Amino acid sequence: MKKTIMASSLAVALGVTGYAAGTGHQAHAAEVNVDQAHLVDLAHNHQDQLNAAPIKDGAYDIHFVKDGFQYNFTSNGTTWSWSYEAANGQTAGFSNVAGADYTTSYNQGSNVQSVSYNAQSSNSNVEAVSAPTYHNYSTSTTSSSVRLSNGNTAGATGSSAAQIMAQRTGVPASTWAAIIARESNGQVNAYNPSGASGLFQTMPGWGPTNTVDQQINAAVKAYKAQGLGAWGF
């Protein structure tokens, strides 16, 4: 997803301190007081706010890793961009904001939607930038639906399981949906010769996987013992 819009003096109030535009200073999350949880929530659930305005005035360059995802927020004081991607490099969301016109394009399950917007600008030579298709999977802002570059999805059952996992672990449902899509393509009865099985492809030591509830319980046990590292994050 790639968007362009004229930079505004409005900013999402995040309690982030930084440097004025033009200083060229690049601040990482460790250098400033960044509300990481709020930035994560904006990236997953309030992308319209991130596209409407930078997270603060002036130039900034903020990067951090949380719950298996790398988050990036940058601005040169005039244009701004944000993105988040899985630790293994699969891009989950991306926005590059600059100029006056923008075109939004993203995948939501199997449906492709587009939104266009035109704003007044003092720059008469700004061109709209359309969304590229290089990202490996995209998430909608209203569900945990995920589609990988190879076509894998979490499916309806997997998306429901991802929501339950989010409630039981505190890890975003979109993360669990991505894991399910990658590990089993949303197939409840998926089995690997290594012994891994179910939506989450857990090993027998974490418990039986005959039902979806058992698969969720096994995944919770694996997460509590090893975190997202149990799935390579």
From Swiss-Prot:
GO terms for cellular component: extracellular region. Keywords: Glycosidase, Hydrolase, Secreted, Signal. Its main location: secreted. Pfam families: SLT (PF01464). One of its GO terms (molecular function) is hydrolase activity, acting on glycosyl bonds. It is found in: Secreted. Residues 1-29 form the signal peptide. The keyword Secreted applies. Its EC number is 3.2.-.-. The keyword Signal applies. Disulfide bonds: none annotated. InterPro entries: Lysozyme-like_dom_sf, Transglycosylase_SLT_dom_1. Is able to cleave peptidoglycan. Belongs to the transglycosylase family. IsaA subfamily. This is Probable transglycosylase IsaA. The lineage of its organism: Bacteria, Bacillati, Bacillota, Bacilli, Bacillales.
